[in-house]
Amino acid sequence: MGVDGELKKKKCIIAGVITALLVLMVVAVGITTSRNTSHSEKIVPVQIKTATTAVEAVCAPTDYKETCVNSLMKASPDSTQPLDLIKLGFNVTIRSIEDSIKKASVELTAKAANDKDTKGALELCEKLMNDATDDLKKCLDNFDGFSIPQIEDFVEDLRVWLSGSIAYQQTCMDTFEETNSKLSQDMQKIFKTSRELTSNGLAMITNISNLLGEFNVTGVTGDLGKYARKLLSAEDGIPSWVGPNTRRLMATKGGVKANVVVAHDGSGQYKTINEALNAVPKANQKPFVIYIKQGVYNEKVDVTKKMTHVTFIGDGPTKTKITGSLNYYIGKVKTYLTATVAINGDNFTAKNIGFENTAGPEGHQAVALRVSADLAVFYNCQIDGYQDTLYVHSHRQFFRDCTVSGTVDFIFGDGIVVLQNCNIVVRKPMKSQSCMITAQGRSDKRESTGLVLQNCHITGEPAYIPVKSINKAYLGRPWKEFSRTIIMGTTIDDVIDPAGWLPWNGDFALNTLYYAEYENNGPGSNQAQRVKWPGIKKLSPKQALRFTPARFLRGNLWIPPNRVPYMGNFQ
């Protein structure tokens, strides 16, 4: 059998196993119901006889069961197979978001017509909600045609995209909170069902993930694991599944050949980065390398969703610099739009480049780099700003040997992110400000998102040291209810307040957050006086392993081809 035939066979096996597990879930629900009904009755596994029974079973793990059941039944399912019902749920959610976008446009456009700030929020919201549906469509497109021959990776991909959809929708709501408009509540109501449906979809997929662990599926289908290991082996050290174009790029010794060159002095094809980006082929599926020569490039750069597999290579993080000064407080720009550089196209890589926002602490929210792309890698980059410097908005991201500097919430967002061997630099804030390194934005307890600092160095710039006892610095604070941040193997200088973490507002999220420090060192790592919130965790070595790049990002599958230093686990 050829490779294509083998892959099809594997896919059929995987689909069959997932369906079988979901049927087991339905049976379990039926058994539980039977047990609760009568202890004297003989327990008999129930059959899926009606659409109602099947829908109720699939909706069992969700938080919004009534919304789940009503939406699926209204869609008149023609199948009682659990997998088909979950796919139907994705379609229903997409239609719900699209209908809500239209409703918001009809009902709120007139109300926002005389308010530039609110009108801008409404326009941005429409874009974000369309991005949310794109992630849901990714789930549908990959449901039958997934290519990674491991069930766990397939399920995790779905969780990543569902988490991304949730992040986009939450960002829409956050955008309205930045205005003084009363329309924020209207937006919450209009998109209430859509957001509940997305959460329900994540709950269903997460339940599959849990079942895989409980039933030890990788052990049952061990040939899949063996097949995956085969895919990752090759004599030249490059995974065998990497395509010929990428292989040639990776195998090149003495540097990478650029597709285009950007230079201020006219020695390249283009003088601006945005001009070079316009040369990226449509539906690009192979590395497109843009070499950006030494210089300061004052431009707002947007790598759009259509610009995939783009690589930026500079002459050094302090030699090639992209700069801007858009900000929320002085410039009246929405936080999401303040980014000097916005990365939206998947499979993006940046090496040896600096990104900065020069608005200063007076500008308040002023993003230097926003990353919404999936499978993004940054190596030897410098990201400088003050408040909200690095916006790790959504999806999988890996930073290695980078420097990030700032004051308030300067690494924030809801991506699945690992910063490895990075320097985290606290800067001097305004007189009345404290400094918080992280503000992770996980808003649903099942999201696969979180922020991990591994083998990093947390320090302060020289100007901060004299004011550290006045303008105290903290490891982070919970931006959203299920905020998750893990700091491990990191050297923490004497710049962090002994309490370690700071509340966001009163007791918000203190019970539901997930914060952990594991095997850190340095004078700021002493946990004796740390806050004692219920959400603070003490990790075992096994638990800590979950947050290494190999596990948390499934990084072994996609980071090594970028040829950057990479440590999958602890060594």
Swiss-Prot record:
Residues reported in the UniProt entry to bind substrate: T335, Q365, R477, W479
Gene3D superfamilies named among the record's database cross-references: Invertase/pectin methylesterase inhibitor family protein, Single-stranded right-handed beta-helix, Pectin lyase-like
CDD domains, per database record: PMEI-like_3
Residues flagged as site, Transition state stabilizer: Q387
Example GO BP: mucilage pectin biosynthetic process
InterPro entries, sorted: Invertase/methylesterase_inhib, Pectin_lyas_fold, Pectin_lyase_fold/virulence, Pectinesterase_Asp_AS, Pectinesterase_cat, Pectinesterase_inhib_dom, Pectinesterase_Tyr_AS
Family of the protein in this entry: In the N-terminal section; belongs to the PMEI family.
Secretion signal span: 1-28
Keywords for the protein's UniProt record, in alphabetical order: Aspartyl esterase, Cell wall, Cell wall biogenesis/degradation, Disulfide bond, Glycoprotein, Hydrolase, Secreted, Signal
GO molecular function terms listed in the Swiss-Prot or TrEMBL record: enzyme inhibitor activity; pectinesterase activity
Lineage: superkingdom: Eukaryota
Subcellular compartments: Secreted, Cell wall
Name of the protein in question: Probable pectinesterase/pectinesterase inhibitor 58
Principal localisation: secreted
Function summary: Acts in the modification of cell walls via demethylesterification of cell wall pectin.
Any single GO CC term annotated in Swiss-Prot or TrEMBL for this entry: extracellular region
Catalytic activity: [(1->4)-alpha-D-galacturonosyl methyl ester](n) + n H2O = [(1->4)-alpha-D-galacturonosyl](n) + n methanol + n H(+)
Pectinesterase inhibitor 58 as annotated region, ranges: 49-204
Further details from the record: The PMEI region may act as an autoinhibitory domain and prevent untimely PME activity during transport.
Disulfide bonds: C402-C422
